[in-house]
Regions:
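Ligand-binding pockets and gating/stacking loops
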Residues: 1-440
Length: 440
């Protein structure tokens, strides 16, 4: 993951740190971020053109339920199936006529008119790999957030891409992928405390604020002298990149966005005293401040979704741990975004890396199942109350309108204002896939 102040070996285009220093001149600020910003701006992706037309600015909160949530105990119950398939829980009506979900989601049942469900997501591996869910491809390590970062850039001083929740399991290297380290997210492992440790946004221990500003003054003098010798457009923009790097290090807006103690205790309690709930609150603060893409991984500390049944991981965990935290946190996020006028411009996505087996095993749990899983989308212009596709009677496979990972990816990109038909820069990441028509 990208950390301000650490050496970065490669950027989006694969050039080395030495080459970056040659392009950027003296590294008197003591940071490599300005070089990364500069290289990202001045070198377009090989063979890819400029955007076709202006886009509406949107953000995304992408919630990854690592471990593989069961479709039966969430958004696709099967009340008419045999007991060993439907499980011990019933279904409940929602505020969308004809749409029912599991009774373990009473708060979300009252908010489904703001959500769209995909009940026919298919073509996943059935294993613990995040690639299809986070990239739309089995082979890619380039996440949605990295692509959005590369195509849209930063808003003000805020980092464009933030990951909450620690490393993704069993998928080493996922992040910037082919776009390089400059498109990796800022990683915040645990936002549960009242204030996050923001080492990423701090000066090195041996660099005082006074020394930092002295370096900036020296750099400005060097840049002015160099500009007189070379008036090219790239040289003229150097001050901008160093200013952006310095702003990230010193901006109170950036630090405040990561400071949960700024929130009312009553609102923090509404989100829930869990890592998941507090991460959702931080995600809202980030998109409100200008972050384009927040990728939020479900925390193992809140209980794993991998409910095989052994080691006390059976279906009862859904009722006792997982669903109460999920239901409380997600429903509060949707309310909070709506109340702040952010829901229309913020896409919320919920998905795991797989579903669970139709039949409950002899341990009282469900095993891996890649042939069918659900996804929930809300906000960002998504038509609420929509249900895309359906599963068969046993929840084993799509019965209607199967949605593949690349089609899911195309839907996300289109909703975020990236024209999947006209913008040639997106094609390397989705191929010929089209968005789900009912959702865009």
């Amino acid at each position: 993951m990208f950390n301000v102040g650490q050496a970065i070996s490669r950027n989006c285009q694969g050039i080395t740190r030495r080459e970056l220093l040659q392009v950027g001149g003296l590294s008197v600020l003591g940071i490599s971020l300005a070089n990364l910003l500069r290289s990202e701006e001045t070198r377009p992706l090989t063979g890819l053109g400029s955007p076709a037309r202006p886009r509406t600015e949107k953000s995304c909160i992408f919630i990854f339920l690592e471990g593989g949530p069961s479709q039966f105990e969430t958004f696709d119950p099967k009340p008419s199936a045999p007991m060993d398939i439907r499980g011990p829980y019933g279904n409940c009506a929602t505020n969308v006529p004809g749409t029912q979900i599991c009774e373990l989601l009473p708060m979300m049942a009252d908010r489904m008119d703001r959500c769209a469900l995909i009940r026919s997501l298919t073509g996943f591996t059935g294993g613990h790999t995040a690639r299809p869910a986070l990239t739309g491809s089995f082979n890619s390590l380039t996440t949605y957030g990295a692509v959005v970062t590369r195509l849209k850039g930063a808003i003000g001083d805020m980092p464009p891409y933030v990951h909450l929740g620690g490393k993704i399991f069993n998928t080493p290297g996922i992040g910037g992928g082919i776009l390089g380290s400059a498109c990796d997210p800022i990683e915040i492992r645990d936002p549960f405390g009242r204030q996050v440790n923001l080492q990423q946004f701090s000066l090195s221990a041996d660099v005082t604020p006074q020394r930092f500003h002295q370096r900036r003054e020296l750099l400005n003098a060097v840049d002015q002298a160099r500009a007189k010798a070379n008036t090219g457009a790239a040289i003229e923009r150097m001050d901008t990149f160093h200013q952006r790097a310095a702003n990230i290090l010193t901006s109170p807006i950036v630090r405040n966005a990561f400071d949960l103690s700024q929130e009312r205790e009553t609102l923090r309690e509404r989100y829930g005293a869990s890592h998941f709930g507090q991460s959702l609150l931080m995600a809202r603060r980030l998109v409100e401040a200008g972050t384009r893409f927040v990728q939020l991984k479900w925390y193992d500390w809140d209980g794993p979704w991998d409910i095989h049944g052994f080691n006390s991981t059976g279906i009862e965990r859904m009722e006792e741990e997982l669903m109460p935290r999920f239901d409380q946190g997600l429903s509060t996020l949707l309310d909070d975004l709506r109340d702040r006028g952010l829901l229309a411009s913020t896409l919320v996505v919920v998905v795991g890396e797989m579903g669970r087996t139709p039949r409950i095993n002899h341990w009282g749990g469900r095993d891996h199942w890649g042939n069918l899983l659900f996804a929930l989308l809300a906000g960002g212009g998504i038509p609420g109350g929509t249900v895309v596709g359906s599963s068969d009677a046993h929840g084993a496979a799509p019965a209607t309108f199967p949605v593949q990972p690349d089609e899911f990816a195309a839907t996300i990109y289109r909703t975020l204002g990236i024209d999947t038909n006209l913008d040639p820069r997106i094609r390397p990441f989705i191929g010929s896939a089209a968005p789900v028509a009912a959702l865009v």
